[in-house]
Design a protein with these regions (language model features):
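Flexible, compositionally biased loop and terminal segments
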Residues: 1-227
Length: 227
């Protein structure tokens, strides 16, 4: 979800206007994803590094997040969309976190699509947190070091109940992972568009999925073995 600030700056508008337009793009993409049959959609809404932004901008973003979560509950309920959140959520303001937890609880039983908001999230931080949880289990005698493998590690990630992403879309021409789902994106197809996030439309999502479907995903195997 890159480009909110640049979108606003290019129009001579305050950055908060770009963030509000970005929230509208979220609504479009969530609706389009449901229509297209996407089962899991994860949005990088607020990174761990975003805490380094000016305090005033962080307050605006937290207010916008709270407004979005409260305002979208009817849509989530009507479309049977399950809401989740990943990240170091205890860093969020208490009122925002409370409303987020309520929305998550209200939609917990839905299965049409899972919408995950990555908030106060960093891929490196997630791996560190998973490692700490495993180390604590070893310390308590619940695990032996030789029992630790990839499958066990995955169980301690924030995304333990989610599939690995098939497609990673980067807007505004960015060509890096930016600390997003580092473990999970090992074999994700990366699609880069020059569109800034506030301009991202259903048609852009369709184009990204179409490009994904044209790719030959080998997962490290040769073409012959894959066939």
């Amino acid at each position: 979800m890159d480009g909110n600030g640049r979108w606003a700056t290019a129009r001579g508008l305050p950055r908060v206007v770009g963030h509000r337009s970005g929230a509208e793009a979220v609504r479009r993409v969530v609706e389009a994803s449901c229509e297209l049959g996407v089962k899991a959609l994860t949005l990088y809404a607020f990174s761990w590094e975003n805490w380094d932004r000016p305090a005033a901008e962080i307050r605006e973003l937290m207010g916008l997040l709270d407004e979005f979560v409260r305002g979208e509950i009817p849509t989530l309920l009507a479309n049977r969309i399950r809401l989740r959140a990943i990240g170091r959520l205890d860093q969020l303001p208490a009122d925002v976190l409370g409303n987020l937890h309520r929305a998550i609880a209200q939609t917990a039983s839905f299965e049409r699509m899972t919408l995950t908001l990555a908030l106060s999230y960093g891929g490196r931080q997630e791996i560190v947190d998973a490692t700490r949880r495993i180390a604590e289990r070893v310390r308590r005698g619940e695990l032996a070091p030789e029992q630790i493998d990839e499958a066990l590690f995955v169980q301690h990630l924030y995304t333990a109940d989610l599939p690995d992403p098939d497609l990673l879309i980067r807007t505004s021409g960015e060509q890096r992972l930016s600390n997003f789902l580092l473990w999970q994106s090992s074999y994700a197809e990366i699609y880069v568009t020059q569109k800034l996030w506030p301009d991202f439309s259903k048609e852009d999502l369709v184009d990204a999925i179409a490009e994904y479907e044209r790719r030959d995903r080998r997962f490290g195997r040769t073409a012959a073995a894959h066939a």
